[in-house]
Amino acid sequence: MSKNRLPAYPALANELRSASLGINPAELQGLLTGMLSGGLSLNDKSWQALVFDYTNDGMGWPIGALASAEQILLAMSAQLVDTDFELSLLLPEGEGEEALFELADAVAEWINHFISGLGLSGANLKHASVEAKEALEDLEEMSKLGIDEEDDLAEQAELLEQVIEHIKACVLVLHAEFGVKPEQDTKPTVH
């Protein structure tokens, strides 16, 4: 796993709220992950202007919130190219019915912002492979899912966890197609 760590959801939520930014941690991570998966390079600082335009009417962010966004960007960049294929989604945690509804909403928001990030990065989705198009269609369908108050909440919580795992797989498929690949070592191997 990467040395780069994601910020804690509650602390980041407070930071974004105190900065009066109209985005929550799940949305921010989804947006940045979508941008990376769409081909954004870490060397390309244009992501900041795109995020400012998308979230804050083009106005810059306070230094602390911007540093947290960069922390997410670095962590997700490392996770997306890691050979362990492990992604950590920045989602709220908690117990009980209310927490389950909050999690389901955050999952939908994460997906919607991921798809927006793909678009902001300029990914050419029209020329995507069949696998990438299927992954995108799956994400679009999963973004519409919700929790039914009248069904068994424990069962729905389990299904939501399966959805989250499928989201990760879809993200990896899209990043494999459009994302910037890690630089290959060009030095010859000495035996």
From Swiss-Prot:
The cellular component terms of Gene Ontology attached to this UniProt record, alphabetical and capped at eight, are:
cytosol
Domain of life, per lineage: Bacteria
Name the family the entry cites: Belongs to the UPF0149 family.
Please name the PANTHER family in this protein's record.
UPF0149 PROTEIN YGFB
User: Mind telling me which NCBIfam families this protein's record contains?
Assistant: PRK01736.1 (NF002477), ygfB_yecA (TIGR02292)
Q: What is this protein called?
A: UPF0149 protein VC0395_A2053/VC395_2591
